Structures are given as C-alpha cells and as structure tokens.
A protein has these predicted regions:
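N-terminal pre-domains immediately preceding structured catalytic cores
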Residues: 1-129, 133-152
C-alpha cells in the first residue's frame, strides 16, 4: 500500500521502512518488505494530529531527514538537538520527572503536502522525532508530547 502512495507522491521506495502502529504502540523495522524487528514505543498522550501545537503524533508517510546523536552514550540527554553532557540518570530528580530526549534523535519530515508537510501541518517544523526516553517503563502506552519514544 505504501508503494502506491509513494508513487503518487513521486517518491522512491526505500529498502528500509519504519512502520509506526499507534494503536499497538509498536514501531516495526522492515527491510525489502520483510520484518526485521518490532520495537515497543510510545506515541502522544494526545489524540493523533498533524496540526502544530496539538502535541499529537502525526500520521502519514514520513522520512528520517536528520540523524543526531551518533557516538553519544546510551541515555545522553539532548536539549535543542544538542547533547547536554549528562546521561538521564545523572540529572536532578526534578529533571528526571520530565520526558527527556535521550540517546539519539531521528528527525522526521512529512512527505504528504497538506497532510504532514507545509503550513500548520508540517512535521519537520513541529520538531517531531523518534528518540530515546528516560521513562522506558511507559513504553507501550501513549506518554509523549507528539514524538515516538523508544528505549535507549
């Protein structure tokens, strides 16, 4: 099905595909159409939404347009896409209460104009990521502010 959509959008199919299932709170990694691994994830506490400031996880086709965090230790905390020099367990109790962005950032860009690209529905401009979390115990249940959270 996604191949038809890609063709309609004038995009090329990729050998690697990440399929987020919000209902099941799972992220599946496919290679050449075959499932390699299924990961537990957490999407937004809010209903799915592509609209800015909704804090909902966007739907539709996306691409990973930026990878941040290569070489950083597991649990490294990022603020503004920059490592702060501390892993989550080293942060204050107050800071650890927040959903921190940890380990890596895969920044997403929508591929569907008017759905998740452009105007008030632009995933890239909303800074929606796939990233690690300091609250791994919540994986499998909606708990983010729009991003897809995964284990470190």
């Amino acid at each position: 099905m996604y191949e038809k959509k890609l063709s309609f959008l004038g995009c090329q199919a990729s050998e690697h595909l990440l399929l987020a299932d919000i209902d099941q709170q799972q992220l599946e990694h496919l290679f050449q159409g075959r499932s390699l691994k299924v990961y537990k994830m957490s999407s937004s506490k809010q209903p799915p939404s592509c609209v800015e400031n909704s804090l909902g996880t966007p739907w539709g086709l996306h691409e990973v347009c930026q990878k941040i965090g290569e070489g950083q230790p597991s649990g490294m905390v990022f603020e503004g896409r920059v490592p702060i020099g501390a892993i989550a367990s080293e942060c204050s109790d107050e800071k650890q209460k927040k959903n921190l962005i940890t380990s890596r950032i895969l920044r997403l860009a929508g591929l569907e104009k008017g759905v998740n690209q452009g105007g008030v529905v632009d995933t890239f401009e909303r800074y929606v990521y796939i990233h690690g979390t300091n609250h791994e115990q919540n994986l499998g249940s909606p708990s983010s502010s729009g991003c897809l959270q995964m284990s470190n």
